Design a protein with these regions (language model features):
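Short histidine-centered beta-strand/loop micro-motifs
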Residues: 32-36, 53, 77
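Short acidic-glycine-tyrosine-enriched beta hairpin
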Residues: 54-70
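Cytosolic regulatory regions built on CNB/CRP/Popeye-like sensor folds
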Residues: 2-9, 14, 22-23, 57, ...
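Double-stranded beta-helix
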Residues: 1-3, 17, 83-89
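Short, conserved beta-strand element in jelly-roll/cupin
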Residues: 37-50
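Conserved short histidine dyad/triad with adjacent acidic residue
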Residues: 9-11, 18-37, 69-70
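Ligand-binding loop in jelly-roll beta-barrel domains
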Residues: 70-89
Length: 89
């Protein structure tokens, strides 16, 4: 089962999900390990990230709507400072 799902959502879909009311997270250019205790959905507002997993590497850029599944262990490589809306589901 894929633990990283990258999609493009329309403005209407984002509005229906209430993304604009979600929290905001920012991070400067860096690298760090991360694991997910629950599912997270996020909309990348700015930046460029590579997420390295056992399944492979994922390139994530602004405009991507990403779901990180519970149990995922990965390494984030923030290539350009990132800003995202996020929500744990």
């Amino acid at each position: 089962m894929t633990k990283v799902i990258i999609e493009k959502k329309s403005g209407d879909e984002l509005k229906k999900l209430g993304v604009s009311k979600w929290g905001i997270w920012t991070k400067e250019k860096s690298e760090f390990d991360w694991s997910y205790d629950g599912d997270e959905q996020c909309l990348i507002l700015e930046g460029k990230i590579t997420v390295k997993t056992d399944e492979g590497d994922y390139e994530i850029v602004n405009g991507d709507f990403v779901t990180f599944k519970k149990g995922l262990k990965c390494r984030w490589i923030v290539k350009e400072a990132v800003k995202k809306h996020y929500n744990f589901i």
